[in-house]
A protein has these predicted regions:
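Membrane engagement elements in two modes
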Residues: 32-33, 64, 71, 103, ...
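Bacterial Sec-dependent N-terminal signal peptides
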Residues: 2-7, 15-50
Length: 265
């Protein structure tokens, strides 16, 4: 009886192995990982968020906004581009003894967006946002894909910054390209939350000048066709060339679609 059981078991195993040999390649089960539910979904790029910080040296709460930005930069790294735009009623243009960081273009931006207080931010230009809400607003924007991938280089030579911007669109796009020069590590006066004035406050990502006009230049992109723009910016003698960077972003009435930042080398 035991011998018959062994023979039956061997026969069943042989049948199973033989059956497997007859499964066609196109009938085999294959594990598919991360298969998209919608194969025709358009390709997108990872979004880099632009935070325009409208600040001022006479603004006692603006250092609090800076602290939020530092926390966001630590959390998100290069995916957040912060720009300190000095101007408005609490901006300071300087005196013979004290360095000022406010600019006429900063004043123009402040007025254009109908801002009423400082610090206040624009997150991808989706309305004025109080600094206490920046973290949530940035997180929300980062969850949104972008239809454009951007690249940027900035090279210093002979007192000029040579700038090259490239866009790779995954959809047709019409809007504007804006390019700015920023400077880090500027030691200058700042009013503090405790009511004191700190003459040795270090200001970072300070907007120094727009490169291609106050509101940038028109840009039209066609899906699948890369575009590139080149421009130069003269270096102001007051700037520390070792602390300069360039920011480029594309925007339209729907907000900022993509941003990128690169150090000046």
């Amino acid at each position: 009886m035991l011998q018959k059981s062994k023979i039956l078991l061997l026969a069943l195993c042989s049948l199973a192995l033989t059956a497997c040999d007859h499964i066609a390649d196109d009938e085999r089960l294959i594990e598919v990982k991360n298969s998209p539910q919608t194969p025709d979904e358009p390709e997108t790029a990872v979004r880099t968020v632009l935070l325009e910080d409208f600040t001022g040296q006479r603004c006692v709460n603006c250092p609090k906004g800076t602290e939020v930005i530092e926390q966001l930069q630590e959390a998100y790294g290069d995916r957040l581009v912060a720009v300190g735009i000095h101007g408005g009623p609490l901006g300071f243009k300087g005196t013979a003894k004290a360095k000022g960081l406010a600019t006429s273009v900063g004043d123009e931006y402040f007025s254009h967006w109908n801002l009423e207080y400082q610090p206040v931010g624009l997150i991808d230009r989706h309305g004025a946002t109080n600094y206490t809400d920046w973290t949530a607003a940035v997180r929300q924007q980062m969850s949104q894909p972008s239809s454009i991938k951007m690249a940027l280089t900035a090279t210093l030579g002979n007192g000029q910054i040579a700038i090259s911007v490239e866009e790779e669109p995954y959809a047709d796009y019409s809007g504007k390209l804006q390019v700015w020069v920023l400077e880090d590590g500027i030691t200058a006066l700042q009013s503090m939350p405790d009511g004191t004035n700190n003459a040795n406050y270090v200001h970072n990502h300070v907007l120094r000048t727009p490169v291609n006009g106050t509101w940038g230049q028109d840009i039209t992109l066609s899906k699948g066709t890369k575009a590139e723009q080149s421009m130069t910016q003269a270096v102001d003698p007051e700037w520390n060339t070792e602390k300069l960077s360039v920011v480029a972003f594309v925007y339209n009435d729907s907000g900022v679609e993509q941003a990128v930042k690169a150090p000046v080398k």
